[in-house]
A protein has these predicted regions:
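Acceptor/aglycone-binding surface of glycosyltransferases and processive sugar-polymer synthases
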Residues: 72, 78-86, 103-182, 209-219, ...
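Short aromatic/hydrophobic "clamp" motif used to bind/position activated sugar donors
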Residues: 92
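Hydrophobic helical membrane-anchoring modules
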Residues: 1-6, 17-18, 177-238
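Short, well-formed alpha-helical segments that are part of the catalytic scaffolds
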Residues: 15-32
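A conserved acidic beta->alpha catalytic loop
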Residues: 45-53, 99
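Short beta-strand/loop segment that forms part of the nucleotide-sugar
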Residues: 26, 35-48, 68-70
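Catalytic metal- and UDP-sugar-binding loop of GT-A-like glycosyltransferases, i.e.
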Residues: 70, 95-97
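Conserved donor nucleotide-binding strand/loop of the catalytic core
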Residues: 54-86
Length: 238
């Protein structure tokens, strides 16, 4: 694997039924769009304990999908670091297993990495995103983005969009993250923005119309407040 290879990293934890079929279908679409490129698909099982995972797992065994597993559950950040560390592609993209963003959006990330030679491409949600989002999630997202915009000097306040890509320079930065759960995205953008030599692009992307949102865990949100504070402290004391 090398210059023409993209590693697609997909973390999974207690997925809904049909998750494996979605991965196979969407990865097939990407391969059709870029027939001259090799795609390394890596699924990282973050300690799933559901039968849905086991049922889908068997469907991946006969396909060109690499599966990494561990227990117990450690968080999305740790799952992605595990997958990124194991990846062998020159470029890396990560998203969620339900592929919540359009294939065209993923293609924009790929083109920015391949054609524009960007080190890191950060997907940000287009304005119509909030038309699809449940009220509680919408409110929490807007409050979070307000604090990011007001308190941190980084290139975007939409750090939690679940579609990002990077080359080997960006990979090295990503592997420096330490947050195990959701604010690893913010930490990644924060670390990248501190190095002015890194070529970062902010790319607007679109949500698929039929995306189903999971219920938000308020306990995790409380815990992530501490991680936000740690990043904020680092931004001021170095």
């Amino acid at each position: 694997m090398g210059n023409n290879t993209i590693s697609l990293i997909l973390p999974v934890y207690n997925p809904a039924s049909g998750w494996a079929e979605i991965i196979l279908a969407k990865s097939k679409e990407l391969r059709a769009l870029y027939p001259d490129m090799d795609f390394e698909v890596i699924v990282v099982n973050d300690g799933s304990v559901s039968s849905n995972f086991d049922n889908g797992k068997s469907k991946l065994k006969s396909e060109s999908v690499r599966l990494i597993e561990y227990t117990p559950n450690k968080g999305k950040g740790e799952a992605l670091r595990t997958g990124v560390l194991a990846s062998s592609g020159e470029m890396v993209i990560y998203t969620d297993i339900d592929f919540p963003y359009t294939i065209d959006s993923m293609s924009r990330i790929i083109r920015s990495l391949c054609d524009e030679k960007r080190n890191i491409v950060i997907g940000i949600k287009d304005p119509s995103y909030y038309d699809h989002v449940p009220p509680l999630r919408r409110s929490i997202s807007r409050v979070f983005r307000f604090f990011v915009r007001s308190l941190l000097r980084i290139p975007t306040d939409d750090t939690q969009c679940g579609l990002k890509g990077f080359d080997q320079v960006g990979k090295a930065v990503f592997l420096k993250t330490t947050i195990d759960r959701y604010l690893f995205d913010l930490e990644f953008v924060f670390l990248a923005s501190r190095d002015r030599s890194i070529n970062i692009k902010i790319q607007e992307i679109e949500l698929r119309d039929d995306v189903q949102f999971r219920k938000m865990n308020l306990g995790i949100i409380r815990n992530e407040a501490w991680n936000f504070l740690k990043i904020l402290i680092r931004s001021y004391v170095g």
